[in-house]
């Protein structure tokens, strides 16, 4: 495989950022444990094996100058403090209170995200399907195993961290009716320089990348471990906060003035 083809392969095929960006699971799609005895006999409530991404505010990368756009910058700071920093601290306190014997410190979560990011990329490049099953959630493992079978082996390497990893969010979701078991998801931003080559003698293609890596754990499995869920995009700057009918908060794109006027004069509601 020549360099040009390798570069095309990098852009179109490889890396968690491209493989898992569309791993949002439909809310109606839940995978459950397979029980050896009927539920009527065992009376054990079935728990989902995987869940969709827990919607939250993902701090965007903002390079706006305060002197050129002071109101935009103040709005960005306010959103970060209220929806980012405060929400992270609140959820961290609640999760620590629920699981006092577990380590949910920022340093521990970031360390696990770094290990999973490197481990999954290396396993994907080396076609290590067993390792992918071990390190990834159910849905993500299925996607990456299929991708590994459709691409040649290669050598992936993390060259360096361009900026320091940052924990953006920590969330939990109830997994049973009693409220005793939970899913926990964490979002960590990684700004790295990665390289890819087909073999040791071929030239390497380097690529800087910013990824919002999502890791997840289930409180009822043993041993308790983090797994890679995928990656998600940042919340766009031009979004507005919206409360859904079920009480969850999400951010939707704000319509531009041009589209608003077009809709107004077209008579469409």
From Swiss-Prot:
GO terms for molecular function: ribosome binding. This is Uncharacterized protein C13G7.11. The lineage of its organism: Eukaryota, Fungi, Dikarya, Ascomycota, Taphrinomycotina. PANTHER family: M-AAA PROTEASE-INTERACTING PROTEIN 1, MITOCHONDRIAL. GO terms for cellular component: cytosol; mitochondrial inner membrane; nucleus. It holds the Pfam family MBA1. GO terms for biological process: protein insertion into mitochondrial inner membrane from matrix.
């Amino acid at each position: 495989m020549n360099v040009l083809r390798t570069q095309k392969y990098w852009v179109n095929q490889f890396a968690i950022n491209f493989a898992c960006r569309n791993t949002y699971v439909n809310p109606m799609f839940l995978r459950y444990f397979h029980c050896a005895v009927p539920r009527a006999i065992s009376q054990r409530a079935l728990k989902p094996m995987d869940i969709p991404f827990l919607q939250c505010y993902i701090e965007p990368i903002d390079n706006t100058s305060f002197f050129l756009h002071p109101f935009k910058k103040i709005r960005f700071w306010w959103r970060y403090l209220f929806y980012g920093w405060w929400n992270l601290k609140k959820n961290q306190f609640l999760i620590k209170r629920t699981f006092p014997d577990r380590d949910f410190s920022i340093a521990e979560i970031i360390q696990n995200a770094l290990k999973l990011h490197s481990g999954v990329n290396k396993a994907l490049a080396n076609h290590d399907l067993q390792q992918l099953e071990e390190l990834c959630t159910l849905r993500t493992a299925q996607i990456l195993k299929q991708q590994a079978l459709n691409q040649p082996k290669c050598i992936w390497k993390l060259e360096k961290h361009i900026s320091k990893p940052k924990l953006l969010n920590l969330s939990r979701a109830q997994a049973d009716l009693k409220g005793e078991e939970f899913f926990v998801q964490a979002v960590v931003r990684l700004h790295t320089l990665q390289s890819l080559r087909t073999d040791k003698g071929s030239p390497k293609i380097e690529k800087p990348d910013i990824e919002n890596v999502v890791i997840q754990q289930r409180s009822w499995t043993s041993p308790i471990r983090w797994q890679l869920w995928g990656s998600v995009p940042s919340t766009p700057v031009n979004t507005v906060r919206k409360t859904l009918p079920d009480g969850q908060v999400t951010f939707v794109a704000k319509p531009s003035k041009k589209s608003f006027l077009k809709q107004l004069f077209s008579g469409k509601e």
